[in-house]
A protein has these predicted regions:
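Glycine-rich, basic loop-to-helix element that forms the pyrophosphate-binding segment
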Residues: 1-3
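Secondary-structure boundary motif
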Residues: 26-34, 89, 112, 157
Length: 176
């Protein structure tokens, strides 16, 4: 079903900037032959021009998601472009009766073996809707305990800072 070398997940009510595809087509070839790179991560922005992402110190920064985003507590939503082969290799778990699974699980799974190229460029525009996943996240997560326990387990790796590991251990017991 996915035919391209890389894929980007776009919510139905969001859109890409006019130069998004051109940007990816221009920048991805710089990293396509780097076996340790899983993809690229760009800014998400709002219609008013503000960012939902935190800028990197450099315009291009390469690191794994656990070290960069989790341990350094880098907040904000980003637009990830990932190798299609990896999206197929690591499918999201499905739990009967559960309708939500955190996307972060996938990025943490990739971070165990791959790095990401982080860019200070907006290519994705979104607005958070009332009643959407971001606004109703906690209630939704509580209705999906098996998936959330699976997600918490991802953070128990020794590469994750101790403070975050303790937090995820406690959350694991909440969902259990």
């Amino acid at each position: 079903y996915i035919k391209g070398e890389v894929v980007l997940i776009l919510d139905s009510d969001d859109y890409l900037t006019d130069d998004a595809i051109e940007t990816v087509e221009k920048e991805w070839p710089l990293y396509r032959n780097c076996a340790d790179i899983c993809g690229m991560s760009y800014f998400r922005g709002k219609k008013d021009g503000s960012h939902l992402s935190v800028a990197n110190a450099q315009d291009v920064y390469i690191d794994d998601d656990i070290h960069y985003r989790v341990n350094q507590k880098i907040k904000g939503d980003r637009c990830e472009v990932v190798r299609t082969v990896l999206l197929k290799k690591y499918p999201f778990p499905v739990y009967q009766g559960e309708r939500f699974f955190p996307e972060g699980w996938f990025w943490n799974t990739l971070a165990m073996n791959y790095k990401t190229v982080y860019r200070n460029k907006t290519i994705y525009i979104c607005e958070y809707l009332e009643g959407g996943l971001t606004k109703s996240g906690r209630a939704l997560r509580m209705k999906c305990p098996l998936g959330m326990m699976d997600d918490c387990r991802m953070y128990l790796d020794n590469r994750v800072c101790i403070r975050r590991r303790v937090k995820e251990m406690l959350l694991y017991w909440v969902y259990a």
